[in-house]
């Protein structure tokens, strides 16, 4: 029995200690005052290991993220930052492990930098309140230095100016730190500018600041030597972050102690015995001054709690959504996967299940095919997924689907959309060229050349199919003013060139066909307010009418229009009676699909006087984000912000009466009108809402499902995606002589050792 029990204990211990030899992406090292122990952050927890290396022991094990450990001078306590209550707060705990005590309770990020000389308080950085005498710009990035008692209590401000990585001298009369002059990423390398960090010293008694470093690049992370006169810090003087030594008496003189290349040294700390500890290339090192750095061979005794696949709820967070032409379901994208849901949210079908991203999803006219872009195998291409079984009418309850590549070339192709007749697909090639792909011939042709656009971010180009599939409205950048977009018109067959419809010199954006192709509406800043620098800060919705008849009809007063409508209804009734008597279909009968296709008459544009046939539809300027017309063209619905967040507003175009239609209070909004015109499909802050087009009453579409998420595969994709974005879009074709491919391999090896978004974002 004793033998069996001993075996069970041994097996249990071996299971716990199954882990990783030589793990990577070890961050935020802190060497103990006696130089015997090194703390570090790994996978969101604080670990402890001998300064000689060996098996590391976790001091925290939680679902929250803990980092930035610092030691008390007596070596009995440690402080660290944790987000276990939402934002990052300062905690303190025994150095050997135990219960952590929360010391700060503010709503902003707060991170410890050191203990005071007498170990009675902890210094930390946070953004709370500047002194009235502080002349720096009051941005949230400009933190202050505070202290909090180790036993808890009132927080005191030490410095109103940013003082990062602040540590105190042994007597407590000096604080050494690096500054923060303006926004720049903490992890940017090799840059020189007016906002790079410098090392400073603050005399507590005289309250005097003295700048110690003057290198035009980065100097940061200073720590005192035991004599309180010399100090060590990290600098890019040789082009890569390395450890340097200088002194308060002669700060202009510095000596480089390490000579690492390509990758930066980070997180410098020092023990009382002079041992330095730091991180380089994802691993930990210690060094005695005068000796070479020694890598710590570390083994992580992990319990394998990181699951590769996780069940993730899908109940919001849609990055895009589109209503199906049948009006019965909608497609949406969540975490790069495509789903289709019924309009009540009760039936949801996951369409794609890949580690890469799918986006720009839209339906075919018959609602049986989805077209979208996918970044498969490190290249954006166009794909379709169709319902295979004829007896199945809806995606949300379909059982067999078929995916096929449509446009798959070495070029980047995305942002596809079916033509209304279903015969073609428009898409962007290499972000700036608008092309049309003919599904019958399987050939593509250009309708808007790349010289007419400049894409700054994916998704910033816009086009819209005409109802007759013969034209496309486009938002383009004229050569003279590339970043002041205009609205243009191009033929879907690529002939005739580009026509500038707006010619305003202001921002004209997001044109939409309305009134069965008789007009378009778009947003323009021509009547909007201007900022002091001259840029537009608000816009209006305008309409342009492609025929004189449509323009004249729009100008009728409410009373005049009522008379015209009365006569039209009378004429229609007489036509119905004649048709009925002759045995034919009435004017009100629902046409068959084929008849409906034939009834889509070609759009004939009256070019004579076209630019004069426009009207401002909104009664006052605002920050409108989207706009649609009712099916009869009598109401303008638009999303804009007059209060907190975007709301849905409506304007009666005959009377110009404008009112709040539905209170959304959302930050990110988009919408489209249902095919029958009875409701508005709104996406507000990642959730879908139905708004009745007559009453304005809203009904949330409560999607509540879940998906299996492979976090590791998703993370690997995002890494490749970000790397490719930089390579494809950097303005310098030669990437400024940087060997970008080598950096891909240098950093990709860290991916297996990252299990959270904080570490991933830093990497």
Language-model region placement:
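A short helix->beta-strand "capping" segment at the edge of beta-propeller domains
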Residues: 20-26, 54-56, 302-318, 399-405, ...
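A flexible loop/linker signature enriched in serine peptidases of the S9 family
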Residues: 20-23, 41-47, 55, 60-66, ...
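Beta-strand-rich domains and repeat architectures in extracellular enzymes and scaffolds
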Residues: 21-47, 317-336, 618-634
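Conserved beta-strand position repeated across blades of beta-propeller domains
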Residues: 30, 70, 114, 167, ...
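Short coil/turn segments that connect the beta-strands within blades of beta-propeller domains
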Residues: 34-36, 74-76, 118-120, 171-173, ...
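Conserved blade-ending motifs and adjacent loop-strand segments that build the rim/top face
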Residues: 255-269, 499-511, 625, 662-671
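Intrinsically disordered, Ser/Thr/Pro/Gly-rich linkers and terminal tails that flank
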Residues: 615-616, 640, 644-763
């Amino acid at each position: 029995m004793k033998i069996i029990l001993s075996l069970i204990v041994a097996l249990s211990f071996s299971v716990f200690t199954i882990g990783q030899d030589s793990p990577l992406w070890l961050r935020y090292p802190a060497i103990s005052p006696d130089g015997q122990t090194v703390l570090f952050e790994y996978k969101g927890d604080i670990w402890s290991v001998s300064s000689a290396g060996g098996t590391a022991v976790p001091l925290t094990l939680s679902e929250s993220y803990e980092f930035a450990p610092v030691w008390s001078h007596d070596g009995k306590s440690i402080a660290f930052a944790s987000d276990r209550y939402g934002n990052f707060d300062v905690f303190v705990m025994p150095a050997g492990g135990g219960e952590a005590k929360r010391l700060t309770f503010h709503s902003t990020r707060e991170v410890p930098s050191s203990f005071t000389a007498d170990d009675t308080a902890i210094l930390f950085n946070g953004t709370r309140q500047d002194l009235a005498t502080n002349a720096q710009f009051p941005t949230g990035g400009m933190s202050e230095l505070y202290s909090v008692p180790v036993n808890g209590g009132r927080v005191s401000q030490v410095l109103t100016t940013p003082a990062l990585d602040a540590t105190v001298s042994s007597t407590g009369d000096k604080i050494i730190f690096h500054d923060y002059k303006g926004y720049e990423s903490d992890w940017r390398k090799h840059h020189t500018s007016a906002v790079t960090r410098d090392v400073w010293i603050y005399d507590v008694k005289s309250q005097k600041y003295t700048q110690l470093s003057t290198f035009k690049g980065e100097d940061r992370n200073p720590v005192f030597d035991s004599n309180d006169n010399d100090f060590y810090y990290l600098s890019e003087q040789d082009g890569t972050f390395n450890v340097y030594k200088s002194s308060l008496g002669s700060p202009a003189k510095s000596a480089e102690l390490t000579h690492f290349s390509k990758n930066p040294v980070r997180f410098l700390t020092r023990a009382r015995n002079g041992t330095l500890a730091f991180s380089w290339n994802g691993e930990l090192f210690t060094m005695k001054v005068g000796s070479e750095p020694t890598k710590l061979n570390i083994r992580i005794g992990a319990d394998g709690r990181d699951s590769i696949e996780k069940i993730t709820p899908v109940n919001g967070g849609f990055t895009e959504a589109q209503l199906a032409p049948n009006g019965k379901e909608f497609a949406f994208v969540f975490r790069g996967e495509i789903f289709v849901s019924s309009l009540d949210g009760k039936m949801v079908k996951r369409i794609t299940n890949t580690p890469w991203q799918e986006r720009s999803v839209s339906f075919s006219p018959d609602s049986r095919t989805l077209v979208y872009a996918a970044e498969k195998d490190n290249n954006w291409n166009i794909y379709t997924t169709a319902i295979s079984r004829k007896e199945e009418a809806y995606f949300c309850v379909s059982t067999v689907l078929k995916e096929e590549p449509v446009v798959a070339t070495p070029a980047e192709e995305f942002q596809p959309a079916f033509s209304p007749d279903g015969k073609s697909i428009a898409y962007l090639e290499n972000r700036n060229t608008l092309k049309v792909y003919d599904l019958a011939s399987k050939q593509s042709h250009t309708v808007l050349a790349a010289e007419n656009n400049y894409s700054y971010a994916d998704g910033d180009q816009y086009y819209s199919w005409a109802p007759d599939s013969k034209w496309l409205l486009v938002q383009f950048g004229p050569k003279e003013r590339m970043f002041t977009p205009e609205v243009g018109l191009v033929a879907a067959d690529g002939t005739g060139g580009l026509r500038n419809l707006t010619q305003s010199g202001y921002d004209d954006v997001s044109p939409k066909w309305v009134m069965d192709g008789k007009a378009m509406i778009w947003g323009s800043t021509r009547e909007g307010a201007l900022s002091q620098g001259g840029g537009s800060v608000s816009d209006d919705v305008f309409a342009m009418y492609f025929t004189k008849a449509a323009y004249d009809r729009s100008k009728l007063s409410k009373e005049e229009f009522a008379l015209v409508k009365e006569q039209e209804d009378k004429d229609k009734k007489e036509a119905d009676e004649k048709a009925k008597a002759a045995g034919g279909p009435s004017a009100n009968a629902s046409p068959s699909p084929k008849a409906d296709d034939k009834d889509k008459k070609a759009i004939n544009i009256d070019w004579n006087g076209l630019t004069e046939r426009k009207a401002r539809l909104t009664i006052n300027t605002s920050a409108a984000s989207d706009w649609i017309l009712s099916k009869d063209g009598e109401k303008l619905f638009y999303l804009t912000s007059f209060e907190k967040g975007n709301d849905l507003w409506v304007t009666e175009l005959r009377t110009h009466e404008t009112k709040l239609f539905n209170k959304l209070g959302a930050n990110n909004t988009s919408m489209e009108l249902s095919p029958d015109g009875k409701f508005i499909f709104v996406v507000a802050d990642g959730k879908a809402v139905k708004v009745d087009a007559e009453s304005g009453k809203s009904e949330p579409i409560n999607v509540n499902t879940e998906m299996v998420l492979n976090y590791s595969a998703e993370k690997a994709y995002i890494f490749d995606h970000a790397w490719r974005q930089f390579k494809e879009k950097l303005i310098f074709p030669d990437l400024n002589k940087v060997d970008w491919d080598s950096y891909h391999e240098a950093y990709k090896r860290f991916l297996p050792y990252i299990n959270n978004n904080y570490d991933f974002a830093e990497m």
